C-alpha cells in the first residue's frame, strides 16, 4: 500500500505543474472553486473527506452511487489561491480509495 501511495504522490508532483498552470489561466484569485471526489461508501472515508472542508464556509453535497458502494462528494468553497487548492488536494491523497475528479 505504501508503494502505491508513493507512486500516486510521484504522479501528483509530475502533474502539479500542468494543474497549477490551468488554474492560473482559468481563475482570478480568490475564486469559488468546486472540488469533486468519489470515495468508498464507508463512514471513515466520508468522514475524513468531510474534515477537509469547513461546512460553515463550504457548500457540501454527497450523493451515493446507485449500488451504494461509492459516494460522490462535491464541495464549493471560496479559495484564496492556487496554492490553497493544490494543498487541499494533497491532503485528500491520504484518504484510501479516493478518486479526485
Indicate residue ranges for each PLM-predicted region.
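Long, contiguous binding/interaction regions
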Residues: 2-72, 78-101
Amino acid at each position: 500500500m505504501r508503494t502505491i501511495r508513493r507512486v500516486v504522490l510521484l504522479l501528483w508532483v509530475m502533474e502539479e505543474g500542468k494543474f497549477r498552470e490551468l488554474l492560473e489561466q482559468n481563475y482570478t484569485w480568490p475564486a469559488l472553486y468546486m472540488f469533486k471526489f468519489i470515495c468508498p461508501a464507508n463512514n471513515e472515508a466520508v468522514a475524513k473527506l468531510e474534515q477537509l472542508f469547513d461546512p460553515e464556509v463550504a457548500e457540501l453535497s454527497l450523493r451515493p452511487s446507485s449500488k451504494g458502494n461509492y459516494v460522490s462528494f462535491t464541495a464549493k468553497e471560496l479559495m484564496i489561491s492556487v496554492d490553497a487548492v493544490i494543498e487541499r488536494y494533497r491532503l485528500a491523497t491520504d484518504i484510501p480509495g479516493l478518486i479526485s475528479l
